[in-house]
């Protein structure tokens, strides 16, 4: 018997478009650029005192992901850092570009691509009063034919803190400043006021000894 092959190319079903046979089905995809920034912190206890305080290093890992459906370019990062009293602070190093998941040039992100950056901050003695360091980063990129239209403020990467978007990365300072105070007024007259020579906080600076000279 004879074998007859029957073929057909699909039609889009729209006979009002001036093409009634074998025309492709076209779906228009609207550009939707977006990025997501995340900043995670880890403390290096430089003096090994088991406290977060002066001299310790806060190491930041920053990721910027293209979560939209088109490529973005001209990616820039603007860092904002303050202590617990709102006083501005500045990163010690970075942000420094490290790599990207799809090997694009620095500043360019393909769809789904993630760029990685690092930064650090060395805690100062003046930071103790504020009790914490707050840090966030603003990522700014451009979609095709636009400039600086794609932005995101970093999240801290912790989704169990009841704040899943745009929350700053916070490091608490657990170091407590040591004090030493000498009271130079002594009136040993039994009235209950200044009857004894007193040193406060000397236990914070041991071993020690006290010598009194007339």
Language model: regions and residue ranges:
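Exported/extracytosolic protein signature
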Residues: 1-179
